[in-house]
């Protein structure tokens, strides 16, 4: 079986997969932090902007954009968790 690099081996390098899991976790945390920053900025706008356009803007953030950030962060965290779990299983299998 060939992998993306063209070599023909099967298995996993758990060190690399665990490193990738940490990167994915960090990206999830960065997205969450960015989402929280945008949430704060949106809240501050509500103090300086009133009316229908302001309400529409806030509703669009809360109903459309924020859920996308939440989903992206969750998916990255799930990928991180799966990668870390698979690396742990590989270590157990290889050492057993």
Predicted feature locations:
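N-terminal secretion-targeting helices of virulence/extracellular proteins
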Residues: 1-96
């Amino acid at each position: 079986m060939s992998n993306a690099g063209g070599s023909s081996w099967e298995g996993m390098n758990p060190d690399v997969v665990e490193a990738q899991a940490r990167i994915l976790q960090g990206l999830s945390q960065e997205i969450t932090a960015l989402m929280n920053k945008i949430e704060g900025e949106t809240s501050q706008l509500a103090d300086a902007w009133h009316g229908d356009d302001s309400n529409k803007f806030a509703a669009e953030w809360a109903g459309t954009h924020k859920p996308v950030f939440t989903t992206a962060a969750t998916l990255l965290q799930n990928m991180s968790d799966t990668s870390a779990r698979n690396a742990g299983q590989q270590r157990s299998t290889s050492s057993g």
